[in-house]
């Protein structure tokens, strides 16, 4: 146990943590030299160059004549996936804080760092990408010293590309990170920090043993669900699973016990023995709360059950995805899914498409609102369709967040304009170093859901970074905006929106739909309405045949007769014709800027 070190890697997006992890794995001979990103094994992760899932891997390293076991847990850096980080942090004693030498400290670095400090982890600061021409290691060192209060000589300079500094990092991990504390004689206590689904073996749970020993064939039970299992196989995580006969305190490993449903494995649960259970569960981490909700519908109605199965499988290794069935007049049966943020929503959609071959339509994302009626009862609504009649509502409360934005001084003006446009209120601003500022805002989550992050990146030319935390509910003047086609509301396009923005949004949605809905044989009226009041309208003109073309000269009444006849036909068509809204129109309305 003295020779085990458990550590994770914390960094902002794109500061090079997965590449540096590859170098550590190569240096310890865990893998052969490869073309990169061993731990990002989803195609999607490779393509987008981001880490979505946490990954655990064990390395062996000889240092000063002793053999050490190092368990590395790679974590994502994107704001949507901070729950993945909190789980990984709970399973470690130390963390490598990686900062890009050319970009410096960013919002996500800070928020993940605070999480690590709360769990009392030993922090090893590393400046990565020091081989780049644009690197400014001196200035970045100043920022880190100010942030952590560490000494300058504790900061390691490294490069994931050239492999510089890798030996120093491994030495620091062994010297500075404490070994796991725990009692091998005590009853078994192991924290589950991840689970993956394997179609042959069922669910594989990854855990870290806090106290006690687990052996192959033991009868174990999961503390929170109370279910009992046989440990068919336990082992450690190398590049593949390596079975072992027993795992001791401080080890990180996996257990296979033929579990088939995802509900039974709760990440953050405690594994213990049936014969000698522990008294209490390990204080894990809070349940993940989805922030953004959207309807997900199959394009073909008969794929509904397949979609349910696919979502259940996704939920196995994405604990934060929630879903419940709902139905819509325009789209039929589907699910109301809860996501952590917009990136998460996009990724779930892509994974449905790639891994399960499901084509889905997603509706406008929204957040959950608390609605109070005149009697003072509260109802939580995730879906604009679930809104009670406006006459019964006393007031509506919407969720707020506390956002922290880090940027250079050049972009403060445009960013403040953006935040004010999104109904943000400035809390404070602090200068981190020379020309870097951290700005804090209180903002409604509903304003951020749709396009805030993209716009922040584009007005700051990619230099601003953004992070947020929930900050309670507040009363707000919200109205339900309906979009109607020929007087029929399309429920998938309804949104709850602040009264001040409703007119503008209604007008833009109508204009966008006018471009995207194909012309029919009859004219289509696109209207935006609040209750019974129409606030915007666009008309798609009918496609019509020139019925008078066959008349040569002759009497005007002959032409009029043909035109009247055409008009009657169009009128009849309009009564029975229905308008299909194409999928790309749904997506375009989401991305209105």
UniProtKB/Swiss-Prot annotation:
Residues 2-181 form the tr-type G domain. It comes from the Bacteria. One of its GO terms (cellular component) is plasma membrane. It holds the Pfam family GTP_EFTU_D2. It is found in: Cell inner membrane. Keywords: Cell inner membrane, Cell membrane, GTP-binding, Hydrolase, Membrane, Nucleotide-binding, Protein biosynthesis. It catalyses: GTP + H2O = GDP + phosphate + H(+). Required for accurate and efficient protein synthesis under certain stress conditions. May act as a fidelity factor of the translation reaction, by catalyzing a one-codon backward translocation of tRNAs on improperly translocated ribosomes. Back-translocation proceeds from a post-translocation (POST) complex to a pre-translocation (PRE) complex, thus giving elongation factor G a second chance to translocate the tRNAs correctly. Binds to ribosomes in a GTP-dependent manner. Belongs to the TRAFAC class translation factor GTPase superfamily. Classic translation factor GTPase family. LepA subfamily. This is Elongation factor 4. The lineage of its organism: Bacteria, Pseudomonadati, Bacteroidota, Bacteroidia, Bacteroidales. The gene is lepA.
